[in-house]
Amino acid sequence: MTNLSDLLPRDPSPDALLDVFTEWVESSGISLYPHQEESLLAVLAGDNVIVTTPTGSGKSLIALGAHFAALAEGRRTWYTAPIKALVNEKFFALCEAFGAERVGMVTGDASVNADAPIVCCTAEILANLALREGRGADAGQVVMDEFHFLAEPERGWAWQVPLVELPQAQFVIMSATLGDVTALADDLTRRTGRETAVIGG
């Protein structure tokens, strides 16, 4: 499959980016579901997005499209997950999609290409960066997977801190089990100044 980095349009308009990404997806025999296209349109409009669709509904493709948009717009984008195994899995998937030179990984155990424009990391890594650098952090976009970990008594802070300390970022929040996200969406909009689209909730 063609590397997405090779398809970055000269004009990174929302329409151009959606067309290129859709064609790339369809070249592998996949069609976007309506909720995936709706999510990507919101990302391309500059909105935060909260995706609460069931497991197996293609949230990974939404994340991929979000990273593509950020890369095209010259924004550094972060993918966070709760466990190192999932971070590793996503790192290799994104390397395949964008090329290894564009993707980095940082966990408590390893650091690979940490200055890359797309970085996969555990939630705690990004939270600590947010605490250290805040508004000065190079974080134009944050994709947070398995966001229901926010409710974990011992680890939930790592999902909360970026929302508070990185108001410059566009957030793409994903989980199959979030429940009512009205308050979260309102809070995100207030903190970031971006509209927040809720998909599937």
Regions from the PLM with identified roles:
Residues 10, 18-25, 29-201:
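Conserved P-loop/Walker A NTP-binding site and adjacent catalytic elements of P-loop NTPases
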Residues 1-13:
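Interdomain "pre-motor" coupling segment immediately N-terminal to P-loop NTPase/helicase cores
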